[in-house]
Amino acid sequence: MDIEMVDLLRKMVDEAPFGMYVLDGERKIIFWSQGAEHITGYSSEEMVGKHCFNGGLDHIDSTGLHLCHDFCPMMATIFDGQSREQPVFLKNKAGKRVPVLVHTEPLFSGDKALGAIEYFRVLPVSEYPIPKER
C-alpha cells in the first residue's frame, strides 16, 4: 500500500463519527484516532505506547464491574479471534464516566490474532445510566 493510500485511510478514520484504537498482541495501543481523542479527551500522544489497561479509560460494565484486567472485550478478542459488541462506560480525561458501545475486531496474520481494533460511539445517558462502581 502506498503512502497516499495510507494517508487517505487515516483521514477517513479520523473524520469518522466514532472513536477507534488499535492494540497489538500485548494490549499496547498502537493507533488512537481523532474521534477517540474527541470522545475521551486523551490525545494520541497521551495514549499511543501505553497498555490499554494503564491508559486511564478504566472501562466498567452496566453492573459497575471493572473490565480492564480480567474481563476486557479486547483481550478476549485477541485471545479467541472473535468479534464482540458491548455497552460499557469509559472514564474520560476529566474523570467522568461516558456510556459507549464498543465493537471489537481481531487483527489476523494468517490464522493468528496479532491484536485487535476497537470502535466506540457514545450512547445516550438517558438510556444507559452510569452505574456505581464495584
Describe these PLM feature segments.
Residues 18, 85-86, 102-103:
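Short loop/turn microsegments at loop-to-beta-strand junctions
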Residues 2-28, 32-37:
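Sensory modules in modular signal-transduction proteins
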Residues 36-51:
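PAS/PAS-like sensory domain cap-loop motif
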Residues 5-8, 55-94:
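Terminal output helix/cap of sensory domains in signal transduction proteins
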Residues 24, 33, 61, 92, ...:
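Short, acidic, Ser/Thr-enriched surface-loop or helix-capping motifs
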Residues 30, 84, 91-98, 114:
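PAS-family sensory domains
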Residues 1-5, 121-134:
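PAS-associated C-terminal cap
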Residues 102-116, 122-127:
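Short loop/turn elements at sensory-signaling interfaces that couple input to output
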